[in-house]
Design a protein with these regions (language model features):
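A contiguous pocket-lining binding segment that forms or flanks enzyme active sites
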Residues: 131-182
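A glycine-rich, hydrophobic loop/mini-helix early in the fold
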Residues: 53-122
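Short, conserved phosphate-binding/catalytic loop or strand-edge motifs used
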Residues: 121-129
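Accessory, usually C-terminal, subdomains that scaffold auxiliary metal cofactors
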Residues: 174-231
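Glycine/small-residue-rich interface belts in oligomeric ring/scaffold proteins
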Residues: 16-83
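Extreme N-terminal starter segment of soluble prokaryotic enzymes
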Residues: 1-3
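Short polar catalytic/cofactor-binding loops
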Residues: 7-13
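Conserved small/polar residues in nucleotide/adenosyl-binding loops
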Residues: 233-235
């Protein structure tokens, strides 16, 4: 079973806690993006990233000086969003770390697909960024089928990614792949389930931690997940 999750906007550098094991598998494609991003001025970058001046200036400086092979942070520790705080990888046991290295994949607009111990640099580039160039019509067009090709989950994919990121993978999966997309929410009446954004992010991180602690790759184990209250799952 392979697990996919989204990245987070906020990132940090941590080159001391754990050593990186590898470079991202799609780094040549990342270099193409980096060359383009280095050619943008701050106003153009602000528009592309849909951010304020401060974030645009920060990422302009990042892209201008970025070395994709030095001063790297393991991807699993580089992201600081709610999902990652509830996953709490910094306190994983060695067995749990090996589990996520084998089963967990982080989707990224800049790097494509990341294993937990792939080395990364802080960046801002979301999958929904309106990147239109002479080599692509969008981020989804740029990555195409590349992300799906790198997922090898023995026929089962646990989708813990947002719609923005799962869209880069699900349409390109080969026939026969079972996709499990959990729904984390509360019933509002007899039929409707309401998902709350913050709660969903918390639950996704907790589910990764639960599976890593259990060390299981069996989809049936998901029925035992009971952290943060009830969870339901939908299988496509």
């Amino acid at each position: 079973m392979q697990i996919i999750i989204s990245p987070a906007k906020k990132m940090k550098e941590d080159i001391d806690s754990f050593a990186c094991r590898d470079l991202p598998a799609l780094l040549p494609r990342t270099r193409v993006l980096l060359r383009h991003l280095r050619g943008l001025d701050v106003p153009s970058l602000r528009k592309l990233l849909s951010c304020n001046d401060q974030i645009a200036e920060l990422n302009y400086a990042r892209f201008q000086t970025m070395d994709l092979e030095r001063d790297l942070t393991p991807a699993l520790l580089a992201y600081e969003g709610i999902q990652y705080r509830y996953m709490a990888p910094a306190v994983f046991t060695s067995d749990a770390l090996e589990y996520v290295q084998e089963h967990l994949r982080i989707l990224s607009g800049f790097y494509g697909v990341l294993r937990p111990f792939d080395g990364v640099r802080p960046y801002r580039l979301e999958m929904q960024a309106k990147l239109k160039t002479d080599f692509c019509a969008s981020m989804y067009d740029f990555w195409g089928e590349d992300l799906a090709r790198l997922l090898d989950g023995e026929g089962v994919l646990l989708n813990l990614a947002s719609a923005e990121y799962s869209r880069s993978v699900l349409p390109h999966l080969p026939p026969g792949i079972r996709v499990i997309t959990p729904i984390f929410g509360e019933r509002n009446g007899a039929e409707r389930v309401v998902e709350k954004g913050v709660y969903v992010k918390m639950a996704r991180g907790e589910m990764v931690r639960f599976l890593a602690e259990q060390g299981t790759d069996k989809p049936d184990a998901l029925t035992e997940f009971d952290r943060l209250g009830r969870s339901e799952e939908h299988t496509a």
